[in-house]
Amino acid sequence: MFDNILEQQRIEKAKELKNLGINPYPHFLEKEMSLKTFKDKFSYILEQVEKRDESVNAVVAGRLKLLRIAGKSIFANIEDEDTNLQIYFSKDSVGEELYTILKKNLEAGDIVLVKGFPFVTKTGEFSLHASEVKLATKAIVPLPEKYHGLTDIEQRYRKRYVDMIMNAEVRKDFLVRSKVVSLIRHFFENKGFLEVETPMMHPIAGGANAKPFVTFHNSLGVERFLRIAPELYLKRLVVGGFEAVFEINRCFRNEGMDLTHNPEFTTIEFYWAYHNYKDLMDLTEELFALLLDKLNLGKTIEFDGKMIDFSKPFERITYKDALCKYGGLDRDLIEDKEKILAKLKTDGFEANEKLELGHLQAELFDNYVEEKLINPTFVSDFPISISPLSRRSDENSQIAERFELFICGRELANGFNELNDPLDQYERFLKQIEAKNAGDEEACEMDEDFVNALGYGMPPTAGQGIGIDRLVMLLTNKKSIRDVILFPAMRPLKSELKEKE
């Protein structure tokens, strides 16, 4: 650890500082203001003749990004969470003894506390003229050689802390993510929803069709599953009397990783008694309008080279109409299992002949429709067979009162009128068990306690989930989900695998 020559040199400098009575890791140094506040507060000097104000004695802090030694003076750039600032100090301003120590031992990556006044250099740069410079933290590992940051994308994800040090834009993206979560939370609170927390470890892998992570509870001696979705617990709360609830938290799915999938991801799920899925569409449009406004993005944003228009109302189209309009498929084809199988095989797509009609229609949708839904589009009336927790339509028992929101060819939200008939729910769980026994690893398991909860009566309720990660990808124009997750899942390095062997 810390055994290369550059790291060893820095360790020696840290030891030398200790010998000089300077702690390279002091327990507490208090800064007075951020660099942005310093710039904003003292920008008035730009309008003055002198372009300096020596009556100021402000204290700021930041990481050294660049040092330029010019004889008896040093110019340095420091950076904090928000911005950067040039600082200047000399033998005269900090004293010859301290200047000599700093000149010898300060390096890019070190964190410093600086006291001084604002001034403008001869080249016109707003700066801080330092009277005191204190080392707050000595960096042992040098920053990457390239000042503009890491170029290896894998290294950026594995060492996010270095990525954030070197790339201010990365920090800004995660500030946007934090703001998005905060805005969503306040939006639902202002609508009268109650934020709740439900279990992360479930006795049954349910709530959505996906392969779970399995763990073991030593004390109880039983298997537990990291939650796939919080849905069934949130609906239990509606049964219990909470009429509007939401939860922002992690979900886990033991599946592949790609540009839009990470094994652990963040969602908001919300349930609203005495409302229907059309109300959820209206609510979702309102939420997006708020986010775009508060983030100053306007009604049209760019994502992956495409311009997306968020003007209300969003397009609303049924599942089958979307197959015809966007998939270019005939109505008689999408209603005929044999014709669907033939179409899929002709176009080179895998087709399982054992799948029933609704699942085959889903294959059509995935292959011919989804990528064409660029502007926000609500697709409704899904096949009931792929919607095991949704309420059946009163007009057509083969249709679920369900919708999904697609933007730029990706699903962003899924909502439906909740199934509250306990007998119907029980029968659908039985069909899921049949599918699981037939080899469908993602099929739901029976949850008799949930069915029992429905037996006590759940009021007519609509529920929805929105993927926070994909939403932030959209709002920050990022192609990979790993760009919006601070510490995404990564494949083990070869060296890590060898150590385990």
UniProtKB/Swiss-Prot annotation:
Binding partners and assembly: Homodimer.
Enzyme Commission number, as recorded: 6.1.1.6
Residues annotated for Mg(2+) 2 binding in this entry: E411
Protein's recorded name: Lysine--tRNA ligase
InterPro entries, alphabetized: Aa-tRNA-synt_II, aa-tRNA-synth_II, aa-tRNA-synth_II/BPL/LPL, Lys-tRNA-ligase_II, Lys-tRNA-ligase_II_N, Lys-tRNA-synth_II_C, NA-bd_OB-fold, NA-bd_OB_tRNA
SUPFAM superfamilies: Class II aaRS and biotin synthetases, Nucleic acid-binding proteins
Cellular component per GO, a single term: cytosol
Cellular compartments annotated: Cytoplasm
Required co-factors: Mg(2+)
Example GO molecular function: tRNA binding
Reaction(s) the record says it catalyses: tRNA(Lys) + L-lysine + ATP = L-lysyl-tRNA(Lys) + AMP + diphosphate
Keyword Nucleotide-binding on entry: yes
Keyword ATP-binding part of the UniProt annotation: yes
Gene3D superfamilies per UniProt: Bira Bifunctional Protein, Domain 2, Nucleic acid-binding proteins
Pfam families, per the entry: tRNA-synt_2, tRNA_anti-codon
Textual note on the cofactor: Binds 3 Mg(2+) ions per subunit.
Keywords: Aminoacyl-tRNA synthetase, ATP-binding, Cytoplasm, Ligase, Magnesium, Metal-binding, Nucleotide-binding, Protein biosynthesis
Source organism phylogeny: Bacteria, Pseudomonadati, Campylobacterota, Epsilonproteobacteria, Campylobacterales
GO biological process annotation, one example: lysyl-tRNA aminoacylation
